[in-house]
A protein has these predicted regions:
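Intrinsic disorder in cytosolic terminal tails and internal cytosolic loops
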Residues: 1-3, 454-467, 495-514
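Helix-breaking motifs and short loop linkers at transmembrane-helix boundaries and internal kinks
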Residues: 39, 71, 92-98, 160-161, ...
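Interfacial helix-cap and linker-helix signal at transmembrane-aqueous boundaries
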Residues: 34-35, 66-67, 152-160, 214, ...
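Central cavity-lining transmembrane alpha-helices of secondary-active solute carriers
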Residues: 50-64, 114-118, 304-316
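12-transmembrane solute porter fold
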Residues: 6-22, 27-29, 225-233, 237, ...
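Helix-loop-helix hairpins in multi-pass membrane proteins, especially solute transporters
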Residues: 65-198
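Hydrophobic transmembrane-helix bundles of small-molecule transporters
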Residues: 136, 158-270, 276, 283, ...
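Extracellular/periplasmic helix-loop-helix junction of adjacent transmembrane segments
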Residues: 30-58, 292, 297-302
């Protein structure tokens, strides 16, 4: 393949990844409008967001090995088709339940595409230096896409209805299909590699149980028995998955990969970077709109400061990692992200009273977001290189899937944990003025809706109390984010200082599990 053709292929797969990443966060700015139009309750709001990374995380391991079997070009193109169909269904969803289902279908297409994009890069760019740069661009697109999602959502909501945030995907999918069909190298894959669908179901059961338990545990009026049942389902799903993989001749995940500290550290760094990215953007876009009364577009543009820091740092990391190794970039990126999260909290107007930042100056948040984005760009690019650069060639599809699962688990955890903490602390700390309707305790959205029906004086008192309670949750979520990134920097620094183990022996032939 000629040099120009390789780089145009990189553009094509990067566009595919950009679509996937944008759809992870495009709803953040659309949530207030969507909630009002579809009458979604707080639980449905979180499921609308989480259905996408949840299904992706459950299917990615299977999608990687399926790509090894049928060919990564076929998986990429098939994923694009599914993504386009699901985007159309989501755009015209008539209810929260229908939108949750469409988001899950979107995730099926995304899960087919994501491992294929990275595997196509690895097989196309044979020169190590070029491959590291390509992986750097790929990794940066993932973070930039999540940062651009709120901007795109805000822009479209200024001119169209909320369904446009999904419908915009369709023409891009068509262009990527044409380019992918022309540029991507063919290959029939290896027909001797089976696809273990049951294992994907087991992972999905474990993830659904775990996420449900987290959300139930932070809900007012929680039922302990329900939480226990959800945790039992999660434990059973994950246990059955691990046992099945250890018996399989062709497992979805070779646990020997995790013995390499570089691969394990890359997985942890990728997950934590996405945890922080999703968490910061979720709570910040809500605060900018619901507390500071910014338009969706204005909120999205402010959050774009994250991408301003991420894009150049990711490209720089891609060009440096072959000389420095992943350790300084991963650890340095996580430490920088910690500082960025704390700086964002300190400079958020109205949150830290003694700094005296006036609420009419939202631009104060941008320095913290730039710093946080720069850290995530460093960490995620180095994490990609650590995983894909150290996995055996015959495990390319598996390694790509493991990396993508790390991203989705991080995003899923960020939304589930931080979103639940935000809502739970709001409900626990809101002190409504006497005579205020009880519905305002459910969420800040509900408080705003309730305030619209009150007199100006009552509305102001109610919103002051609601904003104060929301900021309690906002503060805690950013502190949790900073603490998680700091802990990750310590963990990866220690793991990456360990000696690299000898290559694991090839799998012995065993009877497939029944």
């Amino acid at each position: 393949m000629t040099s120009s053709r390789r780089w145009w292929l990189l553009v094509t797969v990067a566009v595919g990844l950009l679509l996937i990443s944008i759809d992870m966060t495009v709803l953040y700015t659309a949530l207030p409008t969507l909630t009002e139009d579809l009458h979604a309750d707080p639980s449905q709001k979180l499921w609308i967001i989480n259905a996408y990374p949840l299904v992706m995380a459950g299917l990615l391991l299977g999608a990687g090995t399926l790509g090894d079997r049928v060919g990564h070009k076929r998986m990429f193109l098939a994923g694009l088709v599914l993504f386009g169909i699901a985007s159309t269904a989501a755009a015209f969803a008539p209810s929260p339940t229908a939108l949750i289902g469409a988001r899950a279908f979107l995730a099926v297409g995304a899960a087919a595409m994501m491992p294929a994009t990275l595997s196509l890069i690895r097989t196309t760019f044979e020169d190590e230096h070029e491959r590291n740069i390509a992986i750097g661009v790929w990794g940066t697109m993932s973070v930039v896409g999540t940062a651009l999602g709120p901007i795109l959502g805000g822009f479209l909501l200024e001119h169209f209805w909320w369904g446009s945030v999904f419908l915009i995907n369709v023409p891009v999918v068509v262009l990527a299909l044409i380019a992918g069909a022309i540029l991507a190298p063919g290959g029939s894959g290896r027909s001797d590699k089976p696809w273990d669908f049951l294992a994907s179901v087991q992972v999905m059961a474990g993830l659904v149980g775990l996420v449900y338990a987290v959300k139930e545990a932070t809900r007012p009026g929680r039922e302990p028995l329900t939480i226990v049942i959800a945790l039992v389902v999660a434990a059973a799903g994950f246990t059955l998955f691990v046992r099945r993989q250890r018996r399989q001749t062709h497992p979805l995940i070779d646990f020997a990969l995790l013995r390499d500290p570089r691969i394990l550290s890359g997985m942890v760094a990728a997950a934590l970077a996405m945890f922080a990215t999703a968490g910061i953007q979720l709570v910040l876009t809500q605060r900018l709109q619901l507390v500071m009364d910014l338009t969706p577009l204005h909120a999205g543009l402010l959050v774009a400061a994250f991408a301003v820091g991420c894009l150049p740092s990711g490209i720089v990391a891609g060009s440096l990692v072959h000389r420095t190794g992943p350790r300084p970039l991963i650890v340095g990126g996580l430490v920088t992200g910690t500082a960025g999260a704390l700086l964002t909290l300190l400079l958020t107007p109205g949150v830290v009273p003694f700094l005296g930042i006036h609420p009419d100056h939202p631009l104060w948040i941008t320095p913290g977001l730039v710093v946080a984005g720069a850290g995530m760009g460093l960490a995620m690019t180095a994490a990609s290189a650590a995983i894909m650069g150290n996995a055996p060639a015959h495990r390319a599809g598996m390694a790509a899937s493991v990396e993508e699962v790390s991203y989705e688990l991080g995003s899923l955890s960020g939304v589930a944990v931080l979103g639940s903490v935000l809502g739970s602390l709001y409900t626990a700390t809101v002190h409504l003025p006497s005579g205020s309707p009880g519905a305002a305790t459910g969420s800040l959205d509900s408080a705003r809706t309730t305030a619209a029906e009150l007199s100006p004086r009552q509305a102001d008192s109610l919103l002051d109390a609601a904003h104060s309670a929301f900021d309690n949750g906002y503060t805690l979520t950013l502190l949790i984010t900073a603490a998680v990134l700091a802990a990750g920097s310590v963990f990866t620094a220690r793991r990456l200082s360990l000696p690299t183990p000898a290559p694991a022996p090839a799998y012995e032939e065993k009877e497939p599990a029944t």
